[in-house]
């Protein structure tokens, strides 16, 4: 296909065999090497890892819960954000530490207000499906500058005003992403 003779390619192929990038087998020919580049192997593994394989349990609060209760949940669960759901359990919004801090700072009535007053509302919530790759999830986190994403599946309930409804099945965070990178770096 390249229009090159075998003797011309032989020295290049011999070098690739010595590096372990390809294997030479008599009567078979050349195949991908068993000592494939660790970086290439790691990136293939990362591209094939799905969110559902690494997601954590969601930390959920109802939209009628008070801001005070949300702050307590945030600290008790040791998370950076809470996923807010409606009475049917569908994604309603998300509330972060920053949201709570901005709302409560200097506001004496903040603790009794419902979280629905403070949260980022759906459809403005960035989320991910369980079947997306962790690379896609990481891109969303970086592009939208968020620390975590709710993992959602389409709800069996009807849409509200043309907006799809989502059931929350998990969450993926920067900590999970960092753990994935660390596991790859140390070869687990």
Q: Where in this protein do the model-derived segments appear?
A:
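Tandem CBS (Bateman) regulatory domains
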Residues: 34-56, 96-146, 160-188
């Amino acid at each position: 296909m390249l229009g090159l003779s075998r003797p011309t390619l032989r020295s290049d192929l011999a070098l690739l065999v010595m590096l372990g990038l390809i294997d030479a087998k008599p009567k078979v020919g050349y195949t991908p090497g068993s000592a494939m580049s660790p970086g290439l192997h790691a990136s293939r593994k990362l591209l094939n890892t799905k969110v559902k394989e690494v997601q954590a349990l969601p930390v959920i609060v109802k939209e009628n819960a008070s801001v005070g209760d949300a702050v307590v949940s945030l600290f008790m669960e040791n998370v950076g954000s809470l996923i807010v759901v409606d009475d049917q359990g569908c994604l309603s919004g998300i509330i972060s530490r920053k949201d709570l801090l901005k709302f409560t700072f200097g506001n004496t009535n903040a603790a009794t207000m419902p979280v629905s007053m403070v949260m980022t509302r759906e459809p403005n919530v960035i989320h991910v499906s369980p079947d997306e790759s962790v690379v896609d999830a990481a891109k969303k986190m970086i592009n939208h500058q968020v620390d975590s994403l709710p993992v959602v599946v389409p709800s069996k309930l009807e849409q509200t005003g043309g907006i799809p409804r989502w059931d929350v099945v998990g969450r993926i965070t920067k900590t999970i992403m960092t753990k994935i990178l660390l596991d790859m770096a140390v070869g687990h």
